[in-house]
Amino acid sequence: MFMGEFLHSIDTKGRIIVPSKFRDNLGSSFVVTRGLDKCLFAYPMDEWKILEEKLKQLPLTKKDARAFTRFFFSGAIECEVDKQGRINIPANLRNYAGLEKDCNVIGVSNRVEFWANDAWEDYVTESEDSFAEIAENLMDFDI
């Protein structure tokens, strides 16, 4: 399980340190792809396989299903952690998420998310203001 929030810098080669707390659960090789809310999602291989199987079940005849799977899989890349605990995030993914210098690496249950620092701070501010309403809307899920 992933939880917590860490601020790291992206170097000039597009590399970022993966927090040591996350490296053990992610493994030496994992998948990074475009996520929702203009961030990147990272999944351990076992979680990626589960998600991949679920997405394969989406009906090919549905336009939204095709669009989502194209978006999700076309942006996916397998990353390996180097000896310094870094991964290289390709330019297309950095551009999608607006990752330039400072990056928030956050744990979200079964995945890790990479956020541009400004975008993350804006998201947190907006979410804090509506957290009670969000929680109320999730009551139907018995949380």
UniProtKB/Swiss-Prot annotation:
Record's subunit section: Forms oligomers.
Segments forming domain SpoVT-AbrB: 5-47, 76-119
InterPro entries the record matches: MraZ, MraZ_C, MraZ_dom, MraZ_N, MraZ_sf, SpoVT-AbrB_dom, SpoVT-AbrB_sf
GO BP annotation list: negative regulation of DNA-templated transcription initiation
Keywords: Cytoplasm, DNA-binding, Repeat, Transcription, Transcription regulation
Subcellular compartments: Cytoplasm, Nucleoid
Record GO terms (molecular function): DNA-binding transcription factor activity; transcription cis-regulatory region binding
HAMAP family reported in the protein's UniProt record: MraZ
UniProt entry tagged with the keyword Membrane: no
Domain of life: Bacteria
Protein family membership: Belongs to the MraZ family.
Protein's name according to its UniProt entry: Transcriptional regulator MraZ
Any Pfam family matching the protein: MraZ
A cellular component annotation (GO) from this entry: nucleoid
PROSITE patterns: SPOVT_ABRB (PS51740)
UniProt KW S-adenosyl-L-methionine keyword: no
